[in-house]
Amino acid sequence: KNMRYNLFCRQIETDILERKFIIINKYCTLDLHPKAKLVLNAPFIMGYKRIEGSKLESRLLIEENGRMEIKYGSYTVYYGADIQVFKGAHLEIGGDASVNVGLNLICANHISIGRWTGGGRNVTIRDNNGEHHISIRGYKTSIPIVIKEHVWLTENCTIMPGTTIEAGAIISARSVVQGHVPSFS
């Protein structure tokens, strides 16, 4: 599986000699549209397991013209993750970090996650509301999210559409965040 995705998959841009590759652990499902792109400028470890024998599945979906990019350093996603990049959306991850069990990352527009930004268990980041339309003038179903460098997203926090989290912030457990979070708060 790893050999096929790293050497023969046109949707994934890799260069093994320059440490730009994907490691897909057991019980991971990848669904990449023929016009999707996964750009790796560093190692991307999908579905990392600490408990030997666990069958908790991790999923990665990138739809038509969707783009996911690991920009700088190694990025590890633990098991139980659900990452979805919808049609025409762009997900940028800085790298040099990891996200624990149960990541739920849904990108319909644009999500940018800075370098050295990690997360605890069951973190949810979504830039959309599931295409539920509300009849309010100017209402948008998806708004970009920006999470800057050195941010820590703790257990069970949810980052909502339109959020900007400045560098060095710590988002506390079970928080629902929408709007602007200042640096080092």
Please report, for each region that a protein language model flagged, where it lies by residue.
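Short beta-to-alpha loop/turn elements within the nucleotide-binding domains of ABC transporters
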Residues: 163, 175
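Gly/Pro- and small hydrophobic-enriched strand-loop and loop-to-helix capping segments
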Residues: 178-184
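Glycine/Thr-rich phosphate-binding loops of Rossmann-like dinucleotide-binding domains
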Residues: 127, 133, 179
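Short, flexible, glycine-rich and Lys/Arg-enriched loop motifs at helix boundaries
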Residues: 53-57, 131-136
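Domain-scale signature associated with acetyltransferase and cell-envelope carbohydrate enzymes
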Residues: 1-126, 148-150, 157-159, 167, ...
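C-terminal segments of enzyme domains that contribute to small-molecule binding surfaces
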Residues: 136-161, 185
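Short-chain dehydrogenase/reductase
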Residues: 170
